[in-house]
Structures are given as C-alpha cells and as structure tokens.
Amino acid sequence: TLYFGNNVDNHVHAHDTRTGKRKWSFAADGSVRFAPVIKEGWIYFGSDDGHIYCVDAAKGTQIWKYRPGPSGEHIIGNGRMVSLWPIRTGVLVENGVLYAAAGIFPYEGLYIVALNAKTGRPVWVNDTAGDQAWGLQYGGMAPQGYIVASSDTVYIPTGRSMPAAFDKRTGKFKR
C-alpha cells in the first residue's frame, strides 16, 4: 500500500500498489504538507488545521487527534483557512513517542510536543519556543521541515535558519 498526504485536497490517501486503486482516503480540515509516518499499522501526520492525527493504516479511520496550539483560531493563508498553529513539520515517531511542532508566527507562540504515540496524550509540551532559538529580534523560530533526532536531542527545522535543539526527555531548549 502507498500512503501519501495531499496539500490540495486535505486528505491522506491509501492506494494499492499493484492495481493503483484507492483503498481509502482520510480528510483533515487543512493541507497535509508532509509525508505521513507509518508505524505498527498506524499512520501519523500533521495538518494546517493545527492537529496531529493518528489513523488506522488498514481502515483509514481516526484513532486519535491532538491540537498542540491553545485554540482553534484560524486565519486566511493563500486563500484558505489555516490554523494560527499549523503543523508545518513532519512528525517523528521513535520508541512509542511522537514529536511534532506547531506554529508559524513566533509572536503567537510555538508548541513543540512529545506525545504518547498510542494514546495521543502529551509526554511533554514546550510552549515557550517562539523566541528561544534565535530571539524575536531575528524573527524567532518558525518550524518548517522534517524533524530528526539523536539519542537525547530532537532537532526542529526552522526553514532557512539553523535547526533548534530540544531535550528529547523533557522538551527543554538546548541551543
């Protein structure tokens, strides 16, 4: 099965690789900009609607969803409604923990999260990351891109700037 997100129709699709036929589609309420992650029969991804989703890979049904941002506020971006705290990073799932980042405007707040991959419940949340990485005088940190990690650090991509590093166990900003 081939799984892919679509930033035009707001869906994650599953297609049979032999026939090309669609098995299922799951609709988010915003663009799905990054490839989903598949682990142990579940699919994880983020959306411009500000939610992180967990979907059953076989059925395409939602298992859980989590909103890192403080509210469901939306703005217009490129002619579409977008959360003030969209998920503009890929998600990373390691050892039963999902890592993601929400937000594009540092002055509105950014949210770096570690969630229990099975339940969607927070392991930790860093809600002070907006000006930590480079300071607001340099534009702050705006998470964009794929997250990577080492044994003790989660690296959040920040578009054109250097990635920001966070302690994998606590979420505390490192550098």
Task: Give residue ranges: language-model regions.
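Hydrophobic or amphipathic alpha-helical targeting/insertion segments
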Residues: 42-66, 117
